[in-house]
Regions:
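Alpha-helical cap/lid subdomain in secreted, periplasmic
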Residues: 1-138, 142, 146, 150-157
Length: 160
């Protein structure tokens, strides 16, 4: 991905860049041959290095980069009713804290709080402003996209 992203940034020469990452950073993953997840110091170091690399590549031309927080999700429940690990708010909070820390190290990078927009009460919800914004607990509905895009565009525009 680094070479592909670098080539794309150099080819497009954007005025501003929007980076939306994080869902996969909250799931259990195999790293260096063992299962791990955010919150494990070794995996956190790996995630942070990859995040720093992404921010450096996307912002390599000096362009303003905006990064969204990850919203809480509810992809489903285990048979016992508990949330799957990636849907646990603690993991999302850890990733978003990592984002905040990484962003603070780059003068051309800012944050858009997508979590607050999609979860205004601080917890997962499928409906916001009377609109069903999530279809499966993770992905946006068509109505959700129509509702979110103007806000997202304005957020990027204001930042640039």
């Amino acid at each position: 991905w680094p070479a592909r992203w670098s080539a794309q940034v150099n080819r497009d020469q954007p005025d501003v860049a929007l980076l939306i990452v994080g869902r996969w950073e909250t799931v259990d993953r195999v790293n260096e041959g063992r299962w791990t997840h955010i919150g494990d110091p070794t995996f956190d170091a790996y995630l942070n290095a990859e995040l720093q690399r992404a921010l450096s590549i996307v912002g390599s031309t000096g362009v303003r980069v905006m990064v969204t927080t990850v919203p809480y999700s509810r992809g489903g429940e285990k048979p016992d009713g508990r949330l799957y690990p990636e849907d646990q708010p603690e993991r999302v909070n850890k990733w978003n804290a990592m984002l905040h820390n990484a962003i603070s190290q780059h003068s051309n990078v800012g944050m858009i709080d997508l979590n607050k927009k999609l979860c205004p009460d601080g917890v997962y919800t499928a409906k916001v402003d009377g609109i069903k914004v999530r279809s499966d607990g993770v992905h946006l509905t068509q109505e959700g996209v129509k509702w979110l895009i103007p806000w997202l565009e304005d957020s990027v525009r204001v930042a640039s």
